[in-house]
């Protein structure tokens, strides 16, 4: 039967070679309507993730975020997009590959550390995230989500005596 064929294919090594769409990320820089452009980018990428959507914008001084569970058209209204003022935006649509499907795991992730606000939108899986998370928790890190993407932010925060760029490079050397 067709069910048997599909089940056998999905268990075969060839199944891992087929393209799969897992999350969508877009970024806009130097545009006065960056949140609306990010919205349209996410709308076009929505086939890559229909669990949740989020946009972070910045004008270089303040950072604004709006994210929620649902389709892009359900998460954002014209009013919401108008309120997300800034010339820089990043957006994310999610299909969970790691972490539970709930509001806490929507992206972009946004943190403030040492007076610097950072937003991250990540597409993919970190192979060594469990080992890194365990190590970081043993050293006092407190995680807010179950996503592996949050590990990168904690690694960066540990490089307290480094510049942003150096902290990012150090964290990337540790992840796989």
Residue ranges, per PLM feature:
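Conserved short alpha-helical segments that host acidic/polar catalytic motifs at enzyme active sites
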Residues: 1-176
């Amino acid at each position: 039967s067709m069910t048997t064929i599909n089940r056998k294919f999905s268990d075969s090594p060839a199944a891992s070679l087929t393209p799969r769409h897992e999350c969508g990320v877009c970024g806009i820089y130097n545009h006065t309507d960056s949140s609306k452009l990010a919205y349209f980018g996410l709308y076009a990428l929505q086939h890559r993730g229909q669990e949740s959507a989020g946009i972070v914008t910045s004008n270089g001084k303040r950072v604004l975020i709006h994210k929620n569970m649902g389709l892009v058209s359900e998460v954002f209204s014209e009013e919401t997009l108008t309120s997300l003022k800034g010339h820089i935006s990043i957006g994310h649509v999610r299909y969970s590959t790691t972490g539970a499907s709930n509001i806490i795991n929507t992206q972009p992730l946004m943190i403030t550390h040492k007076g610097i606000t950072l937003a991250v939108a990540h597409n993919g899986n970190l192979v060594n995230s469990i080992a890194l998370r365990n190590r970081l928790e043993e050293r006092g890190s407190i995680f807010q989500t179950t996503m592996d993407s949050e590990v990168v932010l904690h690694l960066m925060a540990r490089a307290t005596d480094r510049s942003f760029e150096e902290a990012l490079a150090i964290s990337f050397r540790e992840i796989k």
